[in-house]
């Protein structure tokens, strides 16, 4: 662009401004006042004079300086216009000042062509929106000016972007309001103009900073891309030599494997063994020094890679990334998260003791580490075995769940566990209630909250406040009130006259525990809850006054003592008597599932004589059982539930029998190897693992020859699986139990949603839960029998499949896998 073209453009701008000012003068009645128009015209004249001077001086400059001069003059124009506006604002009335600012805004809007479209109607302003400048500026970037306006736009905008007059326009455009409203606003707050000016200044500064930040991000992205191009694909997997303390010998690894039940369990044990620092609070109590954000532990990729390398030795299927992500990785994350969630719960307690989160039979870490680290490992073991009074062992929780027929009973078990001081010889419990109702003292809210947390985990319905108060809090209060009925000297025999039916509450307590006698039973260290002790030496056992099926049914004093001392509660004592007096029902055939006490629900009735004998022994040690209502409400349900429930002892025995001890290469030392999957594949290629441990050898029939017969019972068509689908699930499964659990996800898609409805279900409907659809459960067993035909299918189903199904219902959501995606397709 030469000087002649620039002069012509400026003259066109001057003409357009003059026309608009004259039109506005004719319609002065529509605006504010003549004075405002006069001052507006003066301000326009000053701007025109500045432009004319600029154009005249422009002609004297050589062509080589065309890019710099307009920028200089424009920078000089902006402060001049601002100073003129400030003077007019100070020397005129609010209304006049507003008119001047509005006029100046319109005139400057015409001075800078290309930043707004021409307006045909001179009486109507071309813009009336607040923050017009911001939105219009965005449109300018998207739609660059065209035609004759482009040249002037390049002169005043592109020459020096940092000095754009848009800031002046932004300062003046908020003034474009009607005179009356603006005048009133100015009277109320004379500093509004300066506030708006400061606001837009801050916005411009923020925009500039964000632009710089985006530029730096772009540079970093380019640098990362450049580095990625230099790294060859073969070098993407890092080969690292772990430090000596993270290396295990073959014998040490085999010792851990022998204690593991699955690949995920082995991974968790290796996590504890190799990285004990992840489970300590040393140097981890501080948060971020800059922002104060609390630090959070997590498993790093090197941790996981080292664990995976060891797991692959005994579980080759883990070499498949999909198997690792579906079976081991979720269990690792769940184990690690549960540990720290429990640790946070302990830290919230007043006592600073550390709980034993791991199993009591855990192998001493000193055997696995080098001699130089034995002292450190032993100190870690000592610190990890300090029992906390506020943490319940996993074994205890399992037994509580087996015994509890309702959330209230489960809460009562936890009450005895966490508040042992209320149930000793002092009988302090009758002075307390959950929340201090009835003028009694309030239970420790922190320990009570722990009870509620445990109850909500296993009984999700208790998350509702009303359900908790009605079923659990009321049950706890009844238990505490019932201590007054049981008060009496320990030496005196219990009296029968204090147990009449009129004195019994609606919900009868069957738990009578004592925590102070734990030292007398060294063989049961994991037990924390006991029945009230009874001196069997002084106890006289009368003969029953009814006919007994045989003399072998009668129990001696020593037999009663043994059963009583191994029981968790008086209800558990009755269940153990059932097992002892009905041995024919507790075999591998599981005939007990066909029986109950009353013969209802299509089942057979248990022998009434032996049931009567059970009651005879129970009421001998627990006189409340003489009341028919107590016996029916509390004990009959326990006996029926024991008939439904699987035999825990039999299952443990079955697992012990099928546990495979893989012959490990003791002569080879893993420390001589770099932790490399390829080296492991070469050195540890041995005989195939048993079906329970390998997905490849899990199915008894070759997959190519697998043909699943059609079920001989009616099944809805959406739940029927093709042979191809069954083969895919078999390939993804690690054991027959895992296969059943995957079929559960496949056939019950409605339970595996965000609502977690599966937490309310289990296989049998025990523990106050709903029963899964029997038809689909029967279909799961049909598929299991098809791919895993064995002689003792009943054992496999009860000790492998049912526990896996129940565990899958209890387990929280984990990372989605292919089987879950297919389940969603079926739901659609």
Swiss-Prot record:
GO cellular component: heterochromatin; nucleolus; nucleoplasm
Post-translational changes noted in the entry: Sumoylated at Lys-20 by SUMO1 and at Lys-512 by SUMO1, SUMO2 and SUMO3. Sumoylation probably occurs sequentially, with that of Lys-20 preceding that of Lys-512. It does not alter association with heterochromatin, but is required for the repression of transcription.
Source organism of this protein record: Homo sapiens
Domain BEN: 242-343, 387-487, 548-650, 715-816
Modified residues (Phosphoserine): 164, 379, 489
Description of its domains: The BEN domain 4 is necessary and sufficient for the localization of BEND3 to heterochromatic regions.
PROSITE patterns: BEN
Keywords: Chromatin regulator, DNA-binding, Isopeptide bond, Nucleus, Phosphoprotein, Repeat, Repressor, Transcription, Transcription regulation, Ubl conjugation
Cross-link named Glycyl lysine isopeptide (Lys-Gly) (interchain with G-Cter in SUMO2), sites: 20, 41, 56, 58, 73, 128-129, 137, 142, 158, 176, 427, 512, 528, 700
Reported function: Transcriptional repressor which associates with the NoRC (nucleolar remodeling complex) complex and plays a key role in repressing rDNA transcription. The sumoylated form modulates the stability of the NoRC complex component BAZ2A/TIP5 by controlling its USP21-mediated deubiquitination. Binds to unmethylated major satellite DNA and is involved in the recruitment of the Polycomb repressive complex 2 (PRC2) to major satellites. Stimulates the ERCC6L translocase and ATPase activities.
Protein name listed in UniProt: BEN domain-containing protein 3
InterPro entries cross-referenced by the UniProt entry: BEN_domain, BEND3
Subcellular location: Nucleus; Nucleus, Nucleolus
Region: Disordered, residue numbers: 164-184, 483-504
Covalent cross-link site, Glycyl lysine isopeptide (Lys-Gly) (interchain with G-Cter in SUMO): 20, 512
GO-annotated molecular function: rDNA binding
Subunit structure of this chain's protein: Homooligomer, probably a homooctamer. Interacts with HDAC2 and HDAC3, but not HDAC1. Interacts with SALL4. Interacts with SMARCA5/SNF2H, BAZ2A/TIP5 and USP21. Interacts with the nucleosome remodeling and histone deacetylase (NuRD) repressor complex. Interacts (via BEN domains 1 and 3) with ERCC6L (via N-terminal TPR repeat); the interaction is direct.
